[in-house]
Regions:
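Short beta-strand/turn micro-motifs composed of small residues
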Residues: 110
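A structure-centric signal for secondary-structure junctions around beta-strands
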Residues: 3-4, 103, 137, 167
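Short, structurally constrained coil/turn elements
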Residues: 32, 100-102, 133, 166
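Surface-exposed alpha-helical segments enriched in charged/polar residues
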Residues: 95-98, 161
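N-terminal helical cap/lid subdomain that shapes the substrate entry/recognition surface
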Residues: 2-95, 102, 113-119, 142
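Substrate-recognition "cap/lid" segment bordering the active-site pocket of phosphatases
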Residues: 114-168
Length: 168
């Protein structure tokens, strides 16, 4: 058996704390009391997948969200509630990442969207004083940029083929 050379990490829950309940609570406070029925993580809704794969723009997302929720909220209200789930980048995890980087080729692959991306990059900069979280990795892959998301095998094959990795 060969030793491990490459590691593909996720972002949410690994390096960035995620609190889904905060987004749910924020939308309920804005009047969307059936948030779970419409938008839960386990409810199949193409709106989120389309946003996470870059098929729709931020502005289109806001409009479709309003239509789906059947309530008028401003773009800023939606953005603020949508980003409420984004937590901190615990510094001890970033220190651990630096140690791992010394021994392995590390990559990031995250299902995300441009709204969250912009917000968590600001969080990272505020917490660390540095402006590019992506520098921790040989390459960072975000679903909205590659048009593919987890858990679909094609998303992993995309990275494996682009980086000439051997999955084991």
């Amino acid at each position: 058996m060969q030793s491990i050379k490459n590691i593909i990490f996720d972002l949410g829950g690994i390096f960035l704390d995620i609190h889904y309940q905060l987004t749910k609570d924020a939308f309920i406070n804005l009047g969307i009391e059936n948030f779970d029925e419409l938008f839960s993580q386990h409810h199949a809704n193409n709106l989120f997948e389309d946003l996470e794969t870059g098929k729709i723009s931020e502005q289109t997302f806001y409009q479709l969200f309003r239509n789906e929720a059947n309530v008028y909220l401003s773009d800023e209200q939606i953005k603020t509630a949508w980003n409420a789930l984004l937590g901190r980048f615990p510094l001890e995890r970033l220190d651990w990442l630096k140690q791992i980087k010394e021994k392995y080729n590390i990559y990031l692959f995250s299902n995300t969207n441009q709204i969250h991306y912009d917000a968590f990059m600001k969080i990272y900069e505020t917490e660390t004083g540095k402006n590019d979280f992506n520098n921790h990795f040989l390459k960072a892959y975000y679903s909205q940029n590659i048009g593919l998301r987890k858990p679909y095998p094609a998303s992993f094959l995309y990275i494996i083929n682009e980086q000439n990795l051997v999955p084991e």
